[in-house]
Structure formats: C-alpha cells, structure tokens
Amino acid sequence: MGPLRQFVQNFRLLSGFGTDHRVFLDVVKACASVSDLTSGRALHGCVFKLGHIACSEVSKSVLNMYAKCRRMDDCQKMFRQMDSLDPVVWNIVLTGLSVSCGRETMRFFKAMHFADEPKPSSVTFAIVLPLCVRLGDSYNGKSMHSYIIKAGLEKDTLVGNALVSMYAKFGFIFPDAYTAFDGIADKDVVSWNAIIAGFSENNMMADAFRSFCLMLKEPTEPNYATIANVLPVCASMDKNIACRSGRQIHSYVVQRSWLQTHVFVCNSLVSFYLRVGRIEEAASLFTRMGSKDLVSWNVVIAGYASNCEWFKAFQLFHNLVHKGDVSPDSVTIISILPVCAQLTDLASGKEIHSYILRHSYLLEDTSVGNALISFYARFGDTSAAYWAFSLMSTKDIISWNAILDAFADSPKQFQFLNLLHHLLNEAITLDSVTILSLLKFCINVQGIGKVKEVHGYSVKAGLLHDEEEPKLGNALLDAYAKCGNVEYAHKIFLGLSERRTLVSYNSLLSGYVNSGSHDDAQMLFTEMSTTDLTTWSLMVRIYAESCCPNEAIGVFREIQARGMRPNTVTIMNLLPVCAQLASLHLVRQCHGYIIRGGLGDIRLKGTLLDVYAKCGSLKHAYSVFQSDARRDLVMFTAMVAGYAVHGRGKEALMIYSHMTESNIKPDHVFITTMLTACCHAGLIQDGLQIYDSIRTVHGMKPTMEQYACAVDLIARGGRLDDAYSFVTQMPVEPNANIWGTLLRACTTYNRMDLGHSVANHLLQAESDDTGNHVLISNMYAADAKWEGVMELRNLMKKKEMKKPAGCSWLEVDGQRNVFVSGDCSHPRRDSIFDLVNALYLQMKEPVVF
C-alpha cells in the first residue's frame, strides 16, 4: 500500500505537465485492485481538475474504484452525476451493491428495468441472479427468468449458467435447472460444472455422474473445477464402483499435464482416496505432489482423522508445523483438536491452545473457540472449557451448545443453569442441539419436572415436528425413561408413529428394564422387526434380573449365532448370571472372552472380580485385581467384599491399607464393606477403629448399615449391654436391621432377658417381615420356649408368611445341580439320598481314639 501511495503522490506532482488519460486509467485500476480509497480519492480529484472525468473509460474506472472500496454512497453519488449511463455503468454499481446491500441491489435493478435505456444485459443477470440465492428470494429469481425469456437472453451462455446455478441452489432441479441448462445454445465448461454441481448438491449423484459422462462426449473439456465436482460424486457410490470410477478419473487427469500439476485437482484426488478408505494411495499421491498448499495438508489431516488414523494425523500436523512453509489455519486446528482428544493427549491439545493464543487470527475465529471447548469437555475439564469460552470475542449457538454440553453431565449444576440463563438473555434461538444438552442435564439431575419443561418448549418451538429423523423425539423418550417415567416415554414412543427408529425401540426397552417392567419389555421385543447388539444385551439383562439364567445364556448364544460381537455392556449383563449359578466354569469362559475381545473397561474388571469372589475363587478375583494398574474405588470395594464374604478379614485390611496408600478416598459403600469384613472375621478392634474414622478421618455421618456393623462388632465381644446402650443412644431412630443384629447376638450369647426387649423393638420397627419372625422364633427355640415358637408360627400362618426355601448349587463337570429344601425332583435322587443316609450313619458312629 505504501509504495502505491508514494507513486500516486509523485504522479499528482507530474500531472500538471499533462498526462494521457490512459495513464490515469491504469493508476485508478491499480487503486481499485488493492482497495486503496485514500489514493483513489486523490486521483479522482486530480482527474476532475484536469478534465479527464469527461472520458467515459476514466469515469467508469473511478466509479469501479468506489464500488471495489465499498464506498457505495460515493459510488451512487458519482453515478447520478454521470451523463452517459450504459449497461457497464449500471453493472458496476450493481456489483458494488451486491456485496453488502442485498435489498438495495434489487431496488437498483428495478430502477434499471424501468429506465428507458439501457436495458439489462447478460452480465446484469449474472450479477443479480446469485443475489436472489443469497437473499433466499426464489420468487424474484423466477420473475427474472420470465424477464430473461422476454428479452430473448435465455440461450445466452452467461445467463443460462447463472440460471442453472440459481435453481440448483434452491433445489429446483427438475424441470427448472435442467430446462435452463438444456436451453443454453453454446454450453461452456461453466455450464457443465453448474449442472454437475447442482445434481451433487441435491444428492442426485447418479444424474451428476451421468452428466459428467455426457460432457466427456462433447467438445468441451473438463477443467479443474469439473474434476473437483465429480470426485465427491464418485466417493458417494458403492465402494467398489467408487474406487473404479475415481481411478478412471485419476487416469484422465494423468493424461493431461495441465490438470495433473494443478494443486486444486491433486487436493481433490487425495480427498477422494481418503473418503473411500484408500489411505495408502492418498498418502502416496500427497507425497508425490509437486506443490502443496495449506488445503493439501488440511485435506490429509482431516482424512486421516475420519479414517481413525489418529497417530498419522497428528504426525502430519507435527510435520506441517515444523516445515514452516505454511501456517496452520482454523480448518487445521478444528481437524487436529479432536485427534488429540482421541489420543487422550491433553498435553498436545494444550500446546495447540498456546499456539492459538499466540496467533490472534486464530483466536478471533469462532469455530476454533468451539473446537477448544469440545476438546476440553472430552477430558471433563470444565474449567478450561469455560476459560476458552470466555475468551471468545464472538459466540454463536454452536459455542453455547458446546459449553452447555460440557457442563450437562458434570457435578457443576449451578454453572450449567447460570450459562443457560445467560444464553436466554442473549436472545439466541435455541436449536435441537441445545435441547439435547438440556435433556442430558435433566438425566444427570434426575429431574423429571425439568424434562417436562424442555418437552413443552420443544413442542411450542416446533422442533419436534420439523425433524425428518426423530433425534430429538428419541432423546425425549430416553430422558423420560432414564428419569423413571416410563408412562410418558411410552406416550412419546406412540407419538413418533411411523418415524420410530431402532433407537426409539431400544430407549423404551431400556426404560422398561430399568423400571423392572420385564413383561412389557418382552412384549416390546416381540414387536421389533429390527434389532441390534443393544437390544439383545438388554434381553440378557432382563433374563438375568428375572432369575432366568438359562434363558440369559441362551440369548447370549443367539447374539454370537447372529454374527454380533458382545461388548462390555453385554458381558456386564451376563456376569451376574454366572453369580446366580455359582458357575466358576462360566465365569472363566466370560473372562476368556474379555481377554480375546480386548475389553479393558475398568467397570467390567470390577464386575468380573466381584463375580469370581461370589463363585468362591478369591485366587482368580485377586488376579483380576492385580492385573489392572488403573484400580479404582469400585475394584477395591469388590475385592474387599470378596474377602468379607469368605471371612478373610486380614486380607481385607491389607487391601484397605493399599487403597489408602494410593490416595483413593473411601465412600460409604467401601466403609460398610470393610466393617462387614471385620465382623465376619471377628476383628473387633480393627472394625471399631474403622467405624470411628467415619467421622474423625473422613468427615462423614454413619449410615444405618454402618450402625448395624458397629452393633455387631460390640456384641461379638460379648458386650451386649454396651451394644444395647449404643443402639438406644443413636442420634437416629434404629431400624429393623440394627435390632435384628442385636437380637442374633442375644440368641448367640443366650441373653434371653435382653432378647425379649430387643424382639419387641424389632416387631415395632418392622412387623410384617418374615425374616424377623423367624429370628424371634429361633430365639424362643434356643431358650426352649416352645409356646412362644408355636405362637409365632401360628401368627405367621395367619398372616400368610412363608419362609423362602433354601437352595444350593453344585457344579460337576460343567453341569449345574440345583437342590431346593424338600425337593425330590433330581434325576439321581435315589443314589444321592442313599449316600446322604450312609454319611449320616457314619457320623453317628462313636469315634474310637
């Protein structure tokens, strides 16, 4: 800019000696090309003083300079002062207005239309028709088409091209765009490009490719834009056809050196190969490219990312930065940040953030800020996400959606509501993505009332009815189901009618399962014509929770028979079945599948550990525990629970010590499990120390289960009076579990005097529980109070209380044998009873030492 202004200043000094108007023409054009308004104004004054303004070419050049510098007030003022208004003059003003003054351009065009002379030319329509697209004004576009026909310009190449492009952008392909294309007398490469792009943009890929094939039969040769238009069309086809067609086009390009060396064409070819998954061919072509621009690098980085080649994408970005020929732009950053998230590389993401902060042009780009928010949200770093959000100078609805989504499932509920309040004050219209974040928040806080509010807003805003794919409807259904309102979820399901998808069915099915409505779930399953792994995994869970282990295993086998690969959720639903059957053989099969399938989810490891312990194999449980360095609180709790069930209190204390060294803070569930382990192992002092630490170390209030464990520990030392005092002095009302614990201790230590008092408290706390009555009956029996036993038995009979029958499992050679108390249905019952009787007689025989 500086040298040009110096030149203009020197030119003005020399102009007094007389200068040809053609020199003025060249200098004014130079000012227009770089939008140098200051120099242009100076030249305008000079031209005016010397009388060169009377020259038509010079005046048009000055007019064009004002239009290019977007000084439309000066441009129109000069226009009104001009004596000769030919089509070129009108078109200059129309071009300037079309950049930023859409409606004003249309008014100016109408003024030209009603003027006696001149009439709009083909260039005029080439300027105004694209403006109709930008304004979304198809009515005026069609009106102009009528005017074009009356003016006899419909066969003109420039006008025809503009009409084809306009109709294609409005989606009016048949008959409008195609008729306009067919009417062009001399079709040039732009004509063919317009119709191919029009078909492609309207997802009419077969027609687009057919048009390209017809073009090849014409004298007009495809150019770089044609190749760029047709390659995405090929990529959208069936993979085998796509590869064959794309390679044929590549061969066509190689035979024409002017296309082969064009960087735009090379970028399009690389993009095509990446879209069809031919990564090696894309990489080879990229390496051979003579010249690469930033688009070349961006195409390959984004292509690697879309093909899940995260490391290759990151390595290429690293090469781009260190090569230094071109600098990353916003497109590069938007592509690479999700790659860092996939690689769980927070450090590299932060380095990229630092790079952004050092380059203000990136910091000002809203899309870059949006990508940063999403990146930090993937790591659960809401503070960093909010910081990136607060630094953004301009925020759009995508920015707000990204930050709301970051906070939606975090514990920071107040911040989410505060952000939502600010969004509503910004007067930005919420879209369906915003609603999805709101529903995620509602699920997080289990707020059924809030789900109804969001539902009401969605209906009023018309967001539900505008959906072709019921993404929002499915999300509402899922939110109602997860918040426990299956009735409303079913209403949403019915409302979706023919728009129901597999997601709709699975969401309702999951709602039924979570609410325990297994019959409704099974009925819905029978109605489903399409199923996926999620569906079948839910069916495994239904049978597992319904105590139908054989059916659950049958469903699991059906999953494999259908060629589906069970995932983490499937196995987690199946493992409780192994515990129900107490089948170590089945657990080991599941463990083998987990290893072969590479299922390393920490929650799955915790469940596997727990089931091994429940099946009696502490060795396998501890092996699973030791195998994962990511041990979390759930795994520690499961390991302690396993030791607790088997009375291995010392080992449980060792795990507790290990957890403390790992700086993992225990929760109520873990402490209760530790207390249970101490109770079962008789570790009274250790247990009481852990109980005291609930308040003194961890700053928590004991739960009812923990109070019951403390009572058990005190009573196990024979200090029943102390235990009774502890219960009566509790800051909360003791429940039946606590009184029942104390009653069992009274029975064990033969303290019937205290036991009668405790029994009365127990019945007052829970009078209709079968187990409580059996417990009291056992106490009477231990004290030989048979009248009390009979009285309680009669009372239980009157209340129709039944003690559940005892049940045992025994696995022999992978075959499960079930024995229920009083059951004689086993096929080998005779030999079993004979052996039991023989063992009983041996036990009765006197032992001789």
UniProtKB/Swiss-Prot annotation:
* Gene3D superfamilies, alphabetized: Tetratricopeptide repeat domain
Supply one GO BP term: response to water deprivation
Question: What GO MF annotations does this protein's record show?
Answer: RNA binding
Q: Which InterPro entries match?
A: E_motif, Pentatricopeptide_rpt, PPR_At4g14850-like_plant, TPR-like_helical_dom_sf
Q: What is this protein called?
A: Putative pentatricopeptide repeat-containing protein At5g08490
Q: Give Gene Ontology CC terms.
A: mitochondrion
Q: Which parts of the chain are PPR repeats? A: 20-54, 55-89, 121-155, 156-187, 188-222, 223-260, 262-296, 297-327, 329-363, 365-399, 400-430, 431-465, 469-499, 501-531, 532-566, 567-597, 601-631, 632-666, 667-702, 703-733
The protein's matches in PROSITE patterns, at most eight in alphabetical order, are given as: PPR
Keywords from UniProt, A to Z, are: Repeat
Extract the PANTHER family matched here: PENTATRICOPEPTIDE REPEAT-CONTAINING PROTEIN
Q: Where is this region: Type E(+) motif?
A: 814-844
Q: Which family does it belong to?
A: Belongs to the PPR family. PCMP-E subfamily.
Top-rank taxon, per record: Eukaryota
The keyword GTP-binding belongs to this UniProt entry's keyword annotation: no
Keyword field contains Repeat: yes
Region of interest (Type E motif), ranges? 738-813
Pfam families, per the entry: E_motif, PPR, PPR_2
